[in-house]
């Protein structure tokens, strides 16, 4: 929140700020929601996500980006923002966030891999099921999402293309730590040239 204030004070509206909304950076167990008896408490988690979103909006965030994957959180956050006078704040939904092995290097870097108990397959997306992804995008748009994310990016270019063609809204792709590590390690071992980084990012843009 302090960073948002400082950036907005210095650059005014010359730069837009997107703010991630999730609980996993703050939970002792590494999950994106509150847990009771090994069960994710979806609705109670959403109430905290709403408070987080309102605080970020109050500080000057331009785009709220819920990455938690709780069911129904887009609609609840949209209603809370509108009710409190933040109608112009946009929502980027991590609508298609797969339960992916490609997050590994990031979790190692921030120390959440050791804290994480179990996996996130009960609330993140099944990467073998594209129909589920399309249904989730449609649902989040109905709830008020202004744009959607597909994460990871490169392994799911077909999903990005399908979402973009079907829904005609801004679609963002996230090149995650595992994707980048594959390429950077190949560069370090002189299997690929540095141009591979640029090529991998451009491939996500031109679709």
In which residue ranges do the predicted regions lie?
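Conserved small/polar residues in nucleotide/adenosyl-binding loops
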Residues: 205-207
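Generic hydrophobic/aromatic pocket-lining and core-packing "Φ" positions
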Residues: 4, 46, 53, 74, ...
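Active-site mouth loops of central-metabolism enzymes
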Residues: 29-48, 113-134, 183-198
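Active-site beta->alpha loop and helix N-cap motifs at the rims of alpha/beta catalytic domains
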Residues: 1-52
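Catalytic beta/alpha-barrel core
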Residues: 45, 62-70, 124-129, 146-154
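Oxyanion-binding "anion nests"
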Residues: 135-148
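Alpha-helix-loop-beta-strand connector modules within alpha/beta enzyme cores
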Residues: 1-19, 71-97, 156-179
């Amino acid at each position: 929140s302090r960073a948002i204030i400082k950036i907005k004070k210095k650059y005014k509206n010359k730069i837009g700020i997107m703010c991630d909304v999730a609980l996993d950076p703050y939970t002792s167990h590494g999950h994106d929601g509150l847990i009771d008896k090994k069960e994710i408490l979806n609705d109670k988690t959403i109430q905290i996500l709403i408070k987080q979103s309102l605080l970020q909006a109050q500080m000057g965030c331009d785009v709220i980006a819920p990455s938690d994957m709780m069911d129904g959180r887009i609609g609840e956050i949209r209603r809370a923002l509108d009710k409190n006078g933040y109608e112009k704040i946009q929502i980027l939904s991590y609508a298609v966030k797969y339960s992916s092995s490609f997050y590994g290097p990031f979790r190692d870097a921030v120390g959440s891999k050791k804290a994480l108990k179990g996996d996130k397959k009960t609330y993140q997306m099944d990467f073998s099921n594209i129909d589920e992804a399309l249904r989730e995008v449609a649902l989040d748009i109905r709830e008020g999402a202004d744009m959607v994310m597909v994460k990871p990016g490169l392994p799911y270019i077909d999903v990005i293309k399908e979402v973009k063609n079907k829904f005609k809204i801004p679609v963002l792709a996230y090149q995650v730590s595992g994707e980048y590590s594959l390429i950077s390690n190949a560069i370090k071992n002189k299997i690929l040239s540095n141009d591979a980084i640029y090529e991998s990012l451009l491939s996500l843009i031109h679709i």
